[in-house]
Amino acid sequence: MAETYDFLFKFLVIGSAGTGKSCLLHQFIENKFKQDSNHTIGVEFGSRVVNVGGKTVKLQIWDTAGQERFRSVTRSYYRGAAGALLVYDITSRETYNSLAAWLTDARTLASPNIVVILCGNKKDLDPEREVTFLEASRFAQENELMFLETSALTGENVEEAFLKCARTILNKIDSGELDPERMGSGIQYGDASLRQLRQPRSAQAVAPQPCGC
């Protein structure tokens, strides 16, 4: 039986190698921790249908390799992404320091309107923390990002990170800030009736006015 959904969103999971991107994806899709996680080679893919604000949304999620040698390959997957999880490891300042470069790639190669949530992963390793919550919050605020600390091991805030990103995209569609019909938006309608309901006013038929004669 074919899946039915109102919208399809293309998501990216980006950030340096070793930050737990694949484990976040696995926790979100399978609801369990990926014990034998190796570095991603190129890209990995997962999908899940979720309910967000009364709408059924299919998330197509591309988990990209963090190593520099794969950047030319993974960058080709950025195009047409509606949302992204930008991931760093709270126990590794090096992964935090590279966030600006990853964010530039996302906004340049995907879309200037891409919705990004910053995820400080490995929250379960708090005693080994190298990046404070306050510092990361400041980075998120300066770059107009949402922010959560997550744990792929315990599952803390993993679901919320994906859903918060999807919820923001839906709100932007409702407000007219994002147009699903625009090429490269990373958004597709799953139900044809929704497309008709959300046609721009200029495209809808104008009711005839009485002539007054």
Curated annotation (Swiss-Prot):
PANTHER family: DRAB11-RELATED. A lipid is attached at C211, C213 (S-geranylgeranyl cysteine). GTP binds at residues 18-23, 37, 39-40, 66, 121-122, 124, 152-153. The small GTPases Rab are key regulators of intracellular membrane trafficking, from the formation of transport vesicles to their fusion with membranes. Rabs cycle between an inactive GDP-bound form and an active GTP-bound form that is able to recruit to membranes different set of downstream effectors directly responsible for vesicle formation, movement, tethering and fusion. RAB4B mediates endosomal tethering and fusion through the interaction with RUFY1 and RAB14. Acts as a regulator of platelet alpha-granule release during activation and aggregation of platelets. This is Ras-related protein Rab-4B. Its EC number is 3.6.5.2. It is a lipid-anchor. Coiled coil: none annotated. Regulated by guanine nucleotide exchange factors (GEFs) which promote the exchange of bound GDP for free GTP. Regulated by GTPase activating proteins (GAPs) which increase the GTP hydrolysis activity. Inhibited by GDP dissociation inhibitors (GDIs). It catalyses: GTP + H2O = GDP + phosphate + H(+). Keywords: Acetylation, Cell membrane, Endosome, GTP-binding, Hydrolase, Lipoprotein, Magnesium, Membrane, Metal-binding, Methylation, Nucleotide-binding, Phosphoprotein, Prenylation, Protein transport, Transport. The modification 5-glutamyl serotonin is found at Q67. The modification Phosphoserine is found at S185, S193. GO terms for biological process: D-glucose import; early endosome to Golgi transport; endosomal vesicle fusion; protein transport; Rab protein signal transduction; regulation of endocytosis; vesicle-mediated transport. It comes from Homo sapiens (Human).
